[in-house]
């Protein structure tokens, strides 16, 4: 590669290069060359120390915050980032948290001193969090019973009303500016993706229908534990899934204990584009475990090459950066490593 771009991908046994063709030659005999792994839906660089409030920038106050841009709060020289790169994590989608509409994420490469030089794709999508259909009472030491969320339909309609009002504003001729609704423009003109954070089947179906009714075409499900139940709808609308952390327990007591480990293969076999994400407890430091999540998918039946794509090319496609990275191809960024 030269100037950060891959210039040649070929079989070394079939071609011969001049010794001075490249400034540096690396002997990788017996090793593998991998495209950089991508961790989506990440808060890397947004929080340094959980107990120090001044270093926590992952969440903004308010319910509808599409105008919140995570990239301006991203700390490129975070000490946590230094611990994930040795495991091949070279890119991340920096994603805000909280509210119904959390804000806009951006995609960065992790070898930088400032967010501007780290940028791969700015404001790639807007993230919404759908309300749960069921809730458990009590607290962690004394869990209560599971009960239906009586406010579910009302909360869903609030999201729907927000998008309808945003669309109306963008199509109007008002002289007054509304920065909150202006921030949703990319969803309606196709330049941004709507990332719907949902695990339950009803959440997923309702979220997709809500988006389609408002003219939003580029959709990705984040979490998607029960996405396999909505596979026909996902396939019909070309919607992929950033699958929740698979090193976890099932969400329901009557589910197969190994279901989280099998989920990537189940969705892949159904023809759904799947990537892996790692949000949850200790998500920033445990981002380094992303390749092990892919390894678990292999142990539960997925082909090794397809498992690798879960954290490289598939994720790049879901984030809209596959023309730039995600695989080893001529013309793409030389964001890679040898192991």
Summary of predicted features, one role per range:
Residues 195-199, 218-226, 246, 250-251:
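Catalytic beta/alpha-barrel core
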Residues 211-218, 235-242, 271-273:
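Glycine-enriched alpha-helix->loop->beta-strand junction motifs that scaffold or abut catalytic
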Residues 18, 36-37, 119, 230-232, ...:
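Short, charged, surface-exposed secondary-structure boundary motifs
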Residues 1-34:
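Histidine-rich, glycine-flanked metal-binding segment
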Residues 87-218:
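Polyanionic/metal-chelating signatures
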């Amino acid at each position: 590669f030269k100037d950060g771009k891959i210039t040649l991908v070929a079989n070394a046994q079939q071609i011969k290069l001049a010794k001075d063709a490249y400034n540096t030659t690396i002997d990788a005999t017996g090793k593998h060359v991998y495209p950089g792994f991508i961790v989506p839906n990440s808060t890397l660089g947004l929080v340094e120390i959980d107990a120090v409030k001044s270093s926590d920038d992952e969440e903004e106050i308010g319910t509808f915050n599409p105008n919140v841009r995570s990239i301006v709060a991203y700390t490129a020289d975070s000490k946590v980032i230094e611990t994930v790169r040795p495991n091949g994590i070279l890119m991340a989608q920096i994603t805000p948290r909280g509210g119904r509409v959390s804000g806009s994420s951006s995609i960065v490469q992790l070898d930088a001193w400032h967010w501007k030089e780290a940028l791969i794709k700015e404001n790639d999508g807007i993230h919404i969090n759908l309300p749960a259909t069921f809730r458990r009472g009590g607290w962690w030491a004394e869990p209560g019973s599971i009960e239906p969320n009586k406010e579910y339909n009302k909360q869903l309609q609030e999201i729907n009303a927000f998008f309808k009002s945003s669309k109306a504003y963008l199509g109007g001729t008002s002289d007054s500016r509304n920065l909150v609704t202006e921030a949703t423009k990319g969803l309606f003109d196709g330049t941004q993706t709507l990332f719907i954070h949902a695990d339950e089947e009803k959440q997923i179906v309702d979220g997709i229908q809500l988006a389609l009714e408002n003219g939003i075409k580029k959709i990705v499900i984040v979490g998607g534990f029960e996405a396999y139940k909505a596979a026909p709808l996902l396939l019909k609308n070309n919607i992929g899934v950033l699958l929740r952390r698979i090193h976890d327990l099932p969400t329901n007591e009557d589910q197969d204990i190994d279901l989280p480990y099998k989920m990537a293969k189940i969705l892949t076999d159904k023809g759904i584009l799947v990537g892996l994400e790692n949000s949850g407890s200790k998500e920033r430091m445990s981002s380094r475990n992303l390749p092990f999540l892919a390894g678990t998918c292999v142990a539960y039946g997925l082909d090794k090459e397809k498992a690798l794509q879960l954290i490289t090319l598939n994720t790049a496609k879901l984030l809209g950066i596959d023309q730039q990275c995600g695989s080893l191809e001529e013309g793409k960024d030389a964001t890679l490593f040898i192991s």
